[in-house]
Amino acid sequence: MDIQRVKRLLSITNDKHDEYLTEMVPLLVEFAKDECHNPFIDKDGNESIPSGVLIFVAKAAQFYMTNAGLTGRSMDTVSYNFATEIPSTILKKLNPYRKMAR
């Protein structure tokens, strides 16, 4: 999956996150394949990632690269809490593509 496509989906117009996305996007695609028990291979043997999975990858990358996972913040003595797991609102994008595990 091309990181430029992920950048377009997230409206990222600079190169600030390119290194991160180059590493993270393939990991998230692999996560989606494992989670769905689906290799996303078409009849010709080429990888074919459905649009919902593309959205999952983009949103999950955004979640991990920004403070989108911020769950709490204190002002006195400064304290931040972050969620470390992908939220169910993002994970549910994979539901239509899940197959039963064999």
Curated annotation (Swiss-Prot):
GO term, biological process aspect, one: symbiont genome ejection through host cell envelope, long flexible tail mechanism
Any Gene Ontology CC annotation: virion component
Compartments (UniProt record): Virion
Predominant subcellular localization, coarse grouping: virion
Keyword terms, alphabetized: Viral genome ejection through host cell envelope, Viral long flexible tail ejection system, Viral penetration into host cytoplasm, Virion, Virus entry into host cell
Pfam family, one: Phage_connect_1
CDD domains: gp6_gp15_like (cd08051)
Family in the record: Belongs to the Caudoviricetes gp6/gp15 head completion protein family.
Subunit structure, as described in the record: Homododecamer. Interacts with the stopper protein gp16. Interacts with the portal protein; this interaction occurs at the end of the packaging when the terminase complex is replaced by the connector.
Role, per record: Head completion protein that exhibits an open central channel for viral DNA ejection. Part of the head-tail connector by binding to the portal protein and to the head completion protein 16.
Protein name: Head completion protein gp15
Annotated organism of origin: Bacillus phage SPP1
Taxon lineage: Viruses, Duplodnaviria, Heunggongvirae, Uroviricota, Caudoviricetes
Name of the gene: 15
